[in-house]
Amino acid sequence: MTIETLRVELGERSYDIRVGSAIIGTIGAVCRDAVAGRRVAVVTNTTVGPLYADGVVDSLTAAGFTVLRIDIPDGEEHKTSVTLTSVYDELIKGGLTRDSLLVALGGGVVGDLAGYAAATYLRGVPFVQVPTTLLAQVDSSVGGKTGINHPLGKNLIGAFHQPRAVLIDVDTLATLPQREYLGGLAEVIKYGVVLDGKFFAFLEQNVSALLGRDRQTLVRAITRCCALKAWVVEQDERETGLRAVLNYGHTFGHAVEALTGYTAVLHGEAVAIGMVRAAVLAEARGHSSAGDTRRIRALVEALGLPTELPSFDADSYRDVLLRDKKARDRGLDFVLNRGIGGHEIVRIENLSEVFGICGVGE
């Protein structure tokens, strides 16, 4: 299978995204091109490590690197300052210097936490993303957002720190649990809804192939998602404008995650719920049609994702939403779809109106 290569153009911080099958063994060559130093720390977790870390370490060693492996616990509940400190401890004891490299091997939690460690250790060291979940491959591994959660909210502590490269091997999706795989499809849908109507139609036409994890279909879908993400990041790296569109579905999504303790509902499942709420809100405010909302809901359901908000009272949702990064002095910014393939960011002051439209607290 051909390797698809995309370029994220950010001046001196530009980097390549490589997407393909059976390419994880090229990580040594990728890292050799990325840094002058020859010490690497591979940050992975206790689930991904036994599956792929040995091959990554072997490739890095063959490329001339001295490799330190750091395994962290698996799960969103471990994306914390406690886990981050344990990574710092290993980097310090391992003698990594400013020209050393971190490799993030895993899903979004590993990528976000290892990326934040790279952004802050010795005031910044380079890192490479090797995402092994669909959600991380199409979203969190590209664009330089790194961070950890706080007990009062998700991703409240973080930094922008671009990777030196992103290496996406679709073969790693073969070992991904079904629920996590389906959660990743929510982020795939997101790109079609707010950025590319033709891509949304492609997803509608390829539901069976996506559910069957067809490699060719996945390479095509992941490559398109990464191309769209790169286009957005190139124009708005620090999320001062356009990049906020990538938060479609995340306003209610983050609230669902927080209210369920970051464990009962996966991130992708929460985003799926949030996208359907955003579509309902967009229709009510005249930005899209009932037919658009039906198509969005139908695709979410066809790909095995939830659509209904968990039953918490309106005050609970209000408290969490007002701690959201998208909250402003006067209201909350909602990313709404304009039809399918377009978007609009709307500031809404009256959350009671939103709750009534979206069925919050019912």
Swiss-Prot record:
Cofactor note: Binds 1 divalent metal cation per subunit. Can use either Co(2+) or Zn(2+).
Subcellular location: Cytoplasm
The organism's place on the tree of life at top rank: Bacteria
Keyword Lyase included in the entry's annotation: yes
EC number: 4.2.3.4
Pathway entry: Metabolic intermediate biosynthesis; chorismate biosynthesis; chorismate from D-erythrose 4-phosphate and phosphoenolpyruvate: step 2/7
Top EC group: lyase
Major subcellular location class: cytoplasm
Known role: Catalyzes the conversion of 3-deoxy-D-arabino-heptulosonate 7-phosphate (DAHP) to dehydroquinate (DHQ).
Protein's UniProt name: 3-dehydroquinate synthase
Native species: Geobacter sulfurreducens (strain ATCC 51573 / DSM 12127 / PCA)
The organism's taxonomic lineage, starting at the top: Bacteria, Pseudomonadati, Thermodesulfobacteriota, Desulfuromonadia, Geobacterales
Annotated gene: aroB
